[in-house]
Amino acid sequence: MLQDPEAYWNAKHPQQDILYEGRPVPGRIKRVDWDIRRFIWHDDAILKTVLYQHVFLGTSNPMLGRSGDLVARDIQEFVVDHLKYVGDEKAQGVEEFWLFPTETYILKQGDCEDGAIMIASFLLNAGIAPWRVRVSAGWVKPSPTAPQGGHGYCCYCRETDNQWVVLDWCYNQDSHKDVSEKPLLKERDDYADVWFSFNHLYAWSHSGFAMAGRVKEKETDT
C-alpha cells in the first residue's frame, strides 16, 4: 500500500491548466474555451437532493456507516439506470456540447463525458475525497482488432487498495460488480492512452499527449 496515496496520485502526472472547447455560450454556435475543472460540481444543493431522494433514499450522509467503495458502486448503478446515451450531434445539433451535471440529470441523457462528469460530481457531493475522483479523456479499444475511439469516463481510486478503477456508464459498464471486484484500470486493455484527466481542483496531462479533436461518441454497450 502507498504511504501517502493522496500526495502520490495528485503528483503522478503533471498538473496544468487545460482549456477545452466544450460547448458554446447561449445564442452562439461556435464553441468557446472552458476550464475543464468547472464542469465538475463538488458542492451542489440539487445534486445532494438527488442523492438524498433517489440514490440513498433518505440518507443525508451517505458515508455514515458505509464505505466509499459501496457509495461509488451505488452511484455508478444509479447513473447507468438513469441515463440514456445520446450523442451530441443528435441531442444538441453540434459536434461537441459538454453538459453540466444538473443539465444531464434533468435531460436524463447525454454523451459519454456527460455521464462521467455526473458520476464524478455525485461522488464528491456524497463525501468522497476529491483525490479519489477524476474524469479521464482518452482512447478506448473495444477489442484488439477494433479501431481506437475517443471516450470520457469517471475513474475512482478505491479504498480497497488505493488503486484506480473505472466507473463507466456507457462503455463496457460493470455496475453489477462490487468496486473491490472491478479490474484495475492499469490492467485493462479496453482503456488505452489517456489524454488528460481532471476533477474540480486539478487537471493533469498524461503521457505527453497533445489533445486534439474532441471526445468522440461511444455507442452504449449492450
Map each language-model feature to its residues.
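A structural boundary/capping signal
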Residues: 1-222
